[in-house]
Amino acid sequence: MTQTSAAPTTTPSFYEILNLPFPSTGLSKQQLKIAYHKALLKHHPDKAVAVAKENLPSSNHGPAQPPSNQKITIDAITTAYKTLSDPVQRAEYDRVLRLDRNRVNGAGDKNGNGTVFHTGLEVVDLEDLDCDEGGDEAMWYMACRCGDERGFSLSESDLEREADSGEIVVGCRGCSLYTKVLFAVQDD
């Protein structure tokens, strides 16, 4: 039985706080800075009245907006800006945001959008896996509760294949369990 009678009370995403579209792959540092300054002006207690009267036009690319009854703090705006300004933090935040939205939305639709949600799917970070760098390419592995010490195994080429999504679902080689591994691609 699902609950649909009450609207979920969620905090706005960093993209909603800064009135930016998600995902925003082509977002420049200048666009981010402009959005940050607009958000500060819009939500600052001393400036909010003046900005509300201006009724600024929205952009054509369909930015996400927080619910109008949400109170956005200056600290939240600053945190959003700092997180989205750092490429590594932003990639991690985007992954977590996608994962959370998949859980809320039932993890995909009948058109193949989104990912399939597996009940009991354990989500881990690549750093939580053991790494074996001997041989032609690095291998990451993790023990499964079925007893196989290297039940969940993946190679560097597996990670490269899924670099755009930053996540990969791996099945145990000894049983029917799956785990989702999250990772970030770092440019050297």
Swiss-Prot record:
**Gene encoding this chain?**
dph4
Name it.
Diphthamide biosynthesis protein 4
Q: Which residues form the J domain?
A: 13-97
Q: Which GO terms describe its cellular component?
A: cytoplasm; nucleus
CDD domains assigned = DnaJ (cd06257)
Gene Ontology terms for molecular function: metal ion binding
Q: Which organism is it from?
A: Emericella nidulans (strain FGSC A4 / ATCC 38163 / CBS 112.46 / NRRL 194 / M139)
**Which family does the entry's similarity section mention?**
Belongs to the DPH4 family.
> What is its biological role?
Required for the first step of diphthamide biosynthesis, the transfer of 3-amino-3-carboxypropyl from S-adenosyl-L-methionine to a histidine residue. Diphthamide is a post-translational modification of histidine which occurs in elongation factor 2.
GO BP term, pick one:
protein histidyl modification to diphthamide
Which residue spans traverse the membrane?
Answer: none
Q: Which Pfam families does this one have?
A: DnaJ (PF00226), Zn_ribbon_CSL (PF05207)
Q: Which residues form the signal peptide?
A: none
Record keywords: Cytoplasm, Iron, Metal-binding, Nucleus, Zinc
Localisation per UniProt entry: Cytoplasm; Nucleus
Quote the pathway field: Protein modification; peptidyl-diphthamide biosynthesis
Give me the residues that bind Zn(2+), please.
C144, C146, C172, C175
Predominant place of localization? cytoplasm
